[in-house]
Design a protein with these regions (language model features):
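Intrinsically disordered, low-complexity, mixed-charge
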Residues: 2-103
């Protein structure tokens, strides 16, 4: 899908639904994701999952920027240890106004 204009070109936009597993809670992972996503101009949210070793990320925006975010999710902040990353690409919905941390 296209929809975001950049230099009079339509950029391809998408939505990712990702789950990051490993040592990703208690290491400022959610704030790392929020700050990275905002710098990339993405919208959505990040939240801890109740299982204790996983974080959910919902993000929308330019596909190129989403791919950069995915690289950062794999790396994580200092102190994190990412063991696995599950990603689903879904249709862009435009449902988010900002990128936030959910509780």
């Amino acid at each position: 899908m296209t929809g975001i204009t950049q230099n009079n070109k339509m950029a391809e936009v998408a939505h990712i639904s990702a789950t990051v597993y490993g040592r990703v809670q208690g290491v400022f992972f959610r704030y790392f994701v929020r700050n990275t996503a905002r710098e990339l101009g993405l919208k959505g949210y990040v939240r801890n999952l109740a299982r204790g070793d996983a974080v959910e990320v919902q993000a929308e925006g330019e596909k190129r920027q989403l791919n950069i975010l995915l690289g950062q999710l794999k790396a994580g902040p200092p102190g994190a240890q990412v063991e696995r990353l599950e990603i689903k690409w879904v249709d862009y919905s435009g449902q988010f106004d900002d990128f936030s941390v959910r509780y």
